[in-house]
Amino acid sequence: MGNIFLQLLAVVALCIAPARSDWLPGTATFYGGADGSGTMGGACGYGNLYDQGYGINNAALSTPLFNDGASCGQCYLIICDYSKAPDWCKLGKAITVTGTNYCPPNYDLPYGGWCNATRPHFDMSQPAWENIGIYNAGIIPILYQQVKCWRYGGVRFTINGFNYFELVLVTNMAGSGSIASMSVKGSCTGWIQMTRNWGANWQCLAGLAGQALSFNVTSTGGQTIVFDDAVPAGWSFGQTFSTYHQFDY
């Protein structure tokens, strides 16, 4: 049976591109109910995952995977490690999920539980998890790797905050799915470096109300895109603006 699993792993690796060559071991549980509705919101700040382009195939990431929010939006290909749990794995099945939430350690449990500070663990939406695992297992050993994200449409920017505080939520990002650095430019300013506030929310203290806004975004994959005038003058806090540009890596 071990040979069958190795053959399956090779087939999955050949069919997924582009992808990193290394499969990494981890574990996975599920949450959010049979319809996944309990996974909406989360520590990345995406809110309604359907509206933001992520859907039901999502996961809360343990501390080493979440990386203080720097991994928000990244995509992971996951298979159940059949060689370790043949009774609980669905042979030949794989699922790609987006990191949308944080799974914190539970220090009421020994060593902080499954989402302890050192374990690579995915607390997946139940519908996503059931693609690869048998429900009664509860937790399964997995193999995973980060893969390219695919999204419909362009990158979106939601402008939150107040007065001299701009908090920009970046969503629907393809390619590596996550942001390494970001700057903003008003129609009356030069480029202003932004910093991560929390999750996929980036901030600046510039007082840009009333100005058209451009963004310079570099993905964790190393691609930089300048979104010229992504937000028109006269915008209001709480508005979302879609673009025609998208990341490849």
UniProtKB/Swiss-Prot annotation:
Glycan attachment positions: 116, 216
Domain Expansin-like CBD: 164-243
Domain Expansin-like EG45, residue spans: 41-154
Subcellular locations according to the entry: Secreted, Cell wall; Membrane
Membrane topology recorded in Swiss-Prot or TrEMBL: Peripheral membrane protein
Residues annotated as signal peptide: 1-21
Keyword set, alphabetical order: Cell wall, Cell wall biogenesis/degradation, Glycoprotein, Membrane, Secreted, Signal
Cellular component GO terms held in the UniProt record: extracellular region; membrane
Main localization, broad class: secreted
Membrane spanning stretches: none
GO annotation, biological process: plant-type cell wall loosening
InterPro entries: Expan_Lol_pI (IPR007118), Expansin (IPR002963), Expansin/allergen_DPBB_dom (IPR007112), Expansin_CBD (IPR007117), Expansin_CBD_sf (IPR036749), RlpA-like_DPBB (IPR009009), RlpA-like_sf (IPR036908)
Function: May cause loosening and extension of plant cell walls by disrupting non-covalent bonding between cellulose microfibrils and matrix glucans. No enzymatic activity has been found. May be required for rapid internodal elongation in deepwater rice during submergence.
Family: Belongs to the expansin family. Expansin A subfamily.
Alphabetical list of PANTHER family matching this protein: EXPANSIN-A15
Name recorded for this polypeptide: Expansin-A19
